[in-house]
Amino acid sequence: MKCSLRVWFLSMAFLLVFIMSLLFTYSHHSMATLPYLDSGALGGTHRVKLVPGYSGLQRLGKEGLLGRNCACSRCMGDASTSEWFDSHFDGNISPVWTRDNMNLPPDVQRWWMMLQPQFKSHNTNEVLEKLFQIVPGENPYRFRDPQQCRRCAVVGNSGNLRGSGYGQEVDSHNFIMRMNQAPTVGFEKDVGSRTTHHFMYPESAKNLPANVSFVLVPFKALDLMWIASALSTGQIRFTYAPVKSFLRVDKEKVQIYNPAFFKYIHDRWTEHHGRYPSTGMLVLFFALHVCDEVNVYGFGADSRGNWHHYWENNRYAGEFRKTGVHDADFEAHIIDMLAKASKIEVYRGN
């Protein structure tokens, strides 16, 4: 009887050890597959769960980013000290209109089509399908290398660039974004000579070197039809004004500004001040969403309070501070707020 009890107890003990071993193995395997980081690797006292985000992997709670997501001295994804910025910024909206986001939300479609209403309506998706047979229709900014620093210069057209001597500094950036006319020849010392991105609409378009990306800012379906025509048949010569029938740009570098991103800026950032944001605002927020570091040149008035373009000799030629289309004062306020939030560096010029 004693022998039987001893055998029974030994059997139970072996069974218990076997069950505990199974439980430990299962628990260890399950923990290894969960999206957590071990506290030892972080030098902390808690496990940290990772969640997907536009700027990289982020730590839950108030500790900020788990790690730097770029190699710049400051990164767009760095922990923000500005609740204002965090409440406005949405990294999930792509600034580029592509095959993947062709279908606009109904409210965006209605708003965009009213910017420059046309007598004849067009099926936007059909127009885009034809356009994307000519230009890539892909998002070139989808992936970011955290080991690199993508420094971007957003160069406006303000007269405060005259005599600034910013040219060499501007040219040192990875991306140099300009808009509309923006001549560089003869102004290299102040505005730089390099351009990587040129933002234009049909009525302001000009030929570009092969190494420059043409970013079309469309206000209507006809603008999409125009760029397709200008890169092929040359049939469209007029929108609401004469336009170039043919355009010499690199087809592989043509990008289309996303109307949903356009409206996001109008709703979240400029808050419906003016009918829609200025081209300068559109380019600035494009940069904020694709760059690691953003430096701003040539925005606002000059040191005398005059609003004009750097290629104009008449300092009073550009009195556009507040119109029915744009509210330059409010946009200047947004730029100041972004600078205070350490999201941009603003170079005021002369």
Swiss-Prot record:
The keyword RNA-binding does not apply. The chain crosses the membrane at residues 7-27. Pfam families: Glyco_transf_29. GO terms for biological process: ganglioside biosynthetic process via lactosylceramide; globoside biosynthetic process via lactosylceramide; lipid glycosylation; oligosaccharide biosynthetic process; protein glycosylation; sialylation. It comes from the Eukaryota. Pathway: Protein modification; protein glycosylation; Glycolipid biosynthesis. Disulfide bonds join 70-75, 72-149, 152-291. A beta-galactoside alpha2-3 sialyltransferase primarily involved in terminal sialylation of ganglio and globo series glycolipids. Catalyzes the transfer of sialic acid (N-acetyl-neuraminic acid; Neu5Ac) from the nucleotide sugar donor CMP-Neu5Ac onto acceptor Galbeta-(1->3)-GalNAc-terminated glycoconjugates through an alpha2-3 linkage. Sialylates GM1/GM1a, GA1/asialo-GM1 and GD1b gangliosides to form GD1a, GM1b and GT1b, respectively. Homodimer; disulfide-linked. Homodimer formation occurs in the endoplasmic reticulum. This is CMP-N-acetylneuraminate-beta-galactosamide-alpha-2,3-sialyltransferase 2. It comes from Mus musculus (Mouse). The gene is St3gal2.
